[in-house]
């Protein structure tokens, strides 16, 4: 059976540009990276997090004053992988704008709300879901107890991140995240996860002669 990731990568379009040295071909994501656009697509895991963090650091080195645009369409995934991306977003100098297209669930929603204030967006048909972390453990009773204590600490830390970026009280965040909580783009805006719902690009300002 073919690896679906390998099949997908073989379908990534190539873009050909004319340069003073002739033609140069880029895969579409590398070309968009030149425009300071990064995609978080699919499950959040270590491999993807490494690539996203590397791109963020590269763009910071290129220009520490120019904003970075993060497009998110993710069902969430591994908490530690998501927190690696989150910490890198907060660490670098450029402002990071986030835009949800499709869905931003679980860790995807945390990364969405972690964008720079007034630069967190979602398209009208996007879906956002927040919930508390989950985990499954087996082994000796003492080990299970330690894992349970750790996930409680993790839950508390994630709640604090949502409090920081939404402006909601800790109690309201804890209550909302107690179960899977789905939101439309407008509901996510009202909750403070994003700043604006956008359906089209704002027209460029006309040049003044």
Swiss-Prot record:
GO BP: any one term: protein quality control for misfolded or incompletely synthesized proteins
Compartments where located: Cytoplasm
CDD domains attached to this UniProt entry: S14_ClpP_2
SUPFAM superfamilies reported for this sequence: ClpP/crotonase
Catalyzed reactions: Hydrolysis of proteins to small peptides in the presence of ATP and magnesium. alpha-casein is the usual test substrate. In the absence of ATP, only oligopeptides shorter than five residues are hydrolyzed (such as succinyl-Leu-Tyr-|-NHMec, and Leu-Tyr-Leu-|-Tyr-Trp, in which cleavage of the -Tyr-|-Leu- and -Tyr-|-Trp bonds also occurs)
Source superkingdom: Bacteria
Annotated EC: 3.4.21.92
Coiled-coil regions listed: none
Keywords attached to this entry: Cytoplasm, Hydrolase, Protease, Serine protease
One GO cellular component, as annotated: endopeptidase Clp complex
Gene3D superfamilies named among the record's database cross-references: 2-enoyl-CoA Hydratase, Chain A, domain 1
Oligomer and partners: Fourteen ClpP subunits assemble into 2 heptameric rings which stack back to back to give a disk-like structure with a central cavity, resembling the structure of eukaryotic proteasomes.
Its job: Cleaves peptides in various proteins in a process that requires ATP hydrolysis. Has a chymotrypsin-like activity. Plays a major role in the degradation of misfolded proteins.
Family membership: Belongs to the peptidase S14 family.
Name this protein carries in UniProt: ATP-dependent Clp protease proteolytic subunit 2
Native source species: Mesorhizobium japonicum (strain LMG 29417 / CECT 9101 / MAFF 303099)
Taxonomic path: Bacteria, Pseudomonadati, Pseudomonadota, Alphaproteobacteria, Hyphomicrobiales
Gene that this sequence comes from: clpP2
